[in-house]
Each structure stands twice: as C-alpha cells, then as structure tokens.
Amino acid sequence: RDIQPQTVGKFCFLYRLTYMQNSQQNNKRIAKNTILLYVRMILVMGVTLYTSRIILRALGVSDYGIYNVVGGVVSMFGFINTSLGRASSRFITYALGKGDKEELQKIFNCVVTIHYLIALIVLVLAETIGLWFVTEKLVIPEGRETAAFWVYQSSVLAAFIMLASTPFNGLIIAHERMGAFAYISIFETLSKLLICFLLFIIPFDRLIVYSVLIVLTQTVVRLLYTFYCNKHFEESHYKLVWDKEKSKKIFAYAGWTMNGELAIVGYTQGLNILLNLFFGPVVNASRGIAVQVQGAVMQFFKNFQVAVRPQIIKSYAQGDFSYMHKLVLSCSRYSFYLMLIVSLPVLFQTEYILKLWLGTVPNHCVAFIQIMMFVGMNYTFNTPTTMALHATGNIKRFQIIEGTMLLSVVPVAYILLKYFHISPESVFITYFFIEIVTQIVRVIIIYPMVKMPISYYFTKVMWPIVKVCSLVWIPPLLVNISIPHQGFIKLIVMCIVCVLSTMVCVYVLGMNVSEREFMVKKVKAFKGKFWMK
C-alpha cells in the first residue's frame, strides 16, 4: 500500500530487462550447442559410413554377419537403456532447473543406484537366457562358435558399461555442455576408425580382436564422461543411497517411458513381419533401406532438439511457462524447416541417390523412401510436444493412449492386406496417416497440461508451415522439368535450389517479425566481422 508507483515501474522494468537478458543467454546457448552437435553429426556420420566398408572388408561377409546377429541379441535390451536414460535426464534437468543443489545430489545418487541395479539384472539375464539363445538357437558357421562366444561376452560387457554410465551422459546434457559431448563422441568415432585399420595388422582372429577392442574403446569413452563430470559438476560424486520415495517416482516414470518404447518396437517389427508375410524378404530389404535413409535425414533436426530439451525442462521447473511455450512452438517449426531443407532434394532425386549409393535400386524402395520423408516431417512435431509432457513428469495416461494408437497400425494394416489386398506402399501410407492422427491427439492432451492453448499449435506452428510448403516445391519442380536427365550435375543443382528455396520461403513466410529482425541483425554482425578481417 505504501509502495510508490515509480518504484513499481522500476521493478517491472528491471524484471523485464532481466528476463530478456536470460532469454537471450539461453537462446545463444541453444544456438552454440546446436552448432556443436551438427559438427559432431557430420564428422561421426562421415567416418561411420567409411568404417562400415572397411569393417566389412576386414571381417568378411560371414564374420560381419556373426557380429551383427550376436550383438543384436544384446541390443534387444537397448529399450531399457533408452527409457532409463530419458528418466535420468528428466529428473536431473528438473532438479537443476529448480536450483536446489542438495536435491540435485540426492536425485543423481538415486539415479546412479537404479542404473547399477538394472545393469546387474541385465547382466544376469544376458548370461543365462541370452547366452542359452546364442549357443543353442542361433545358426553359427562351423568353427566360429568360440569367436561368436567372445563377441557375445564383449557385447554384454559393453551393454553393462553403457547402462551403468548413462546418468553421466544425462548430467552433461542437463548442464548443456554439448562441447564435451561432441568432442568425446568424435574421439570414440576416430578410435573405431583406428581399430578398423589395426584389424589388417594384428595377426589374430579378426572378429575376436574387433569385438574386444570395441568394448575397450567404449570403456575408455565411459571413463572420460565420468572423469569430466567429476571434474566439473559437484553432484557427480556418487554416494550409495536408496531413497524409496524418489526411486519409486523414477521407476514409475521409466516404466511408462518403457511402455512407449515397447510400443515403438511393437509397431515397427509388426509392420516388418506383415510385409514379410505378404510380400517376401525383398520388400523387407527395401523397407530397411528406407528406414536407414530416414534415420540419417532425421539427425539434422534431432541434434537441434537435443540442444533445446534441457531448456524446456528447466523453464517448466522454474515456472517460466511463457518461455517454455515459446521454445516448444519454435522448436516444432524450426525442426520441420530443418527436415524440409534436407528432404526436398531426396524427394526429387530419390532414384538417382539410390543408384549412386547402392548401384541397383530394389523394387518399392523409391516410394518407401519418399513416404518415409513425409513421416519424418510429421515426426518433427512429436519430440517438442512430448518434451513438454516429460517436463511435467505426468506421463502415464499419455503413454497408454499414444502406445495404443501407434500399435493400432498393425491390426489395421493386417486387415487391409488380408481383405483389401493393398500394396506395400499403401501400408506405409496407412502408417503415415495414423502418425498424423496420433500427433493431433498428442497436442490435445499435452498442451492443456502445460497451460498452453491448443490454438497455438495451429496458428503459430502449422499455419507458417502451410504457407512455406505451398511455395517451396515450385523452384525444385522447375529444375526437375528443365533438366530431364538424371546425373550428378542435376543432383548438385537440385540441392542448391532446394536449400535456397527453403531459406527464402522460411524467411518470408515461416518467420514472424521479431525472428526476421533477429536474423538480419545476426547476418549484419557476421558480415561486419568478416569484412573487418
């Protein structure tokens, strides 16, 4: 009552100024981390593609197949690590956003204890049921049983180390130290490249040597993550504790996340089996190639989303819903733009890219890839929306509904295949439409939970995207008509035109006024620095 209006005005001004400064710092951190993750992605992807050829040549087709099938038995436990990793990351990031160091220490200790416990359970299962399956059920070429055994044991040890050390990865991402994450990943990739060349020198069984060296590399990498955390983060010094209440929350969260991961495995493998039953293994091979291409293209927006995720959770923990809403909406739009800029050349030049990569293009592969590009574009909206949900920690109802909807594609596809004799391409189109409906349901459920109007999704995300998509395809189409013959020159021209077309359309139609002003300001600042040099 005694506070003067001038004082209130000054307080409001200082609050707005502080808020703007914090937002600018957070945006700069997101941009920096995104760039670091993209540099990591380009290097890792390039080296991985090269090492795949070297490994195949060094091991031979048979041993390479043994390594993949035996290691694949252990990789079935991968969804456990994914679910626990998401739970760890969410609770650590949330505690960090609250600014409670004591709570953060308790959460980290609890998370590490849970990971150690699950790692031991996986180890027991792998050395009993898993080992029995490998030795009794898998078809291993005669004389390679010992090598297969060592490959399996190395894979089990690698899985154990991965599970035990995942909380340290979550800590690095929660603190948004993407530089460390990128540099250690690059070290791991280059180490694997070195191993490939060592295989041609070491005079022992190459398959055994390769599996042992890979697990040694992963051990060193995990130790690097641990040492980095111990040096930079106080809360990373682990103490054995068991907090029943916190453990219950983390287990419940991880359990419902695991339900979602199992649903993904279910509909993915379910569709694969249906395609095999109705059309044979050739269609499975085409689908495998399409999924591989989609996965590579989707990395271009997933790195951006990894950089944004900690800020979404922290802003929710701090009660800053305005900034959180802005992040979710902006992340959805710009993830789509990143996917679009890479998808356009693939959509127009699918057949030539496949010929360049594989030599021979399998049947249905072109159509599969083109449909999966559209699935990937729709998927760009998924992660920012579910990031907001995971920030709340209230995921049970959503995971049940989402998992049921995604799994419904299997019985729907079966009915259409059995009674309406649809084509393999129609199976993918069915999957695409179910993904669209599921995304709409995600928005309807999640937006009210984080106090965001559902209309924002359509006015601030979908409408700018519709405007961009209405024009962005015209210049590439004109190039496609003007240069009728396929070739490398046409591919390069198409890539350049697609990038320029997307950039212009996004700037004119896909950005709001403040975003355009920010972009112009950054370009001018960059030009100023460049000309000064």
Language-model regions, residue ranges each:
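Membrane-interface junctions at transmembrane-helix termini in multi-pass inner-membrane proteins
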Residues: L157-F187, F197, I208, M373-M405, ...
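Interfacial/gating helices of multi-pass transporter permease domains
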Residues: I55-M76, I107, L207-V212, K246-Y253, ...
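Helix-loop junctions and terminal segments of transmembrane helices
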Residues: T82-K98, A174, F233-E234, A290, ...
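Membrane-proximal transmembrane or re-entrant/amphipathic helices at the cytosolic face
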Residues: V8-Q21, Y447-F458, I474-K533
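Interhelical loop/hinge segments that connect adjacent transmembrane helices in multipass membrane
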Residues: Q4, Y15-I30, I208-S211, Y225-Q269, ...
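Membrane-interface helix-loop junctions in multi-pass transport and translocation proteins
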Residues: L56-A58, S62-D63, G179, L190-L223, ...
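Alpha-helical transmembrane segments of multi-pass membrane transport and lipid-handling proteins
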Residues: V112-V139, L198, L223, H325-T380, ...
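Transmembrane helical elements of multi-pass membrane transporters/channels
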Residues: K32-L49, E188, L213-N230, K244-K314, ...
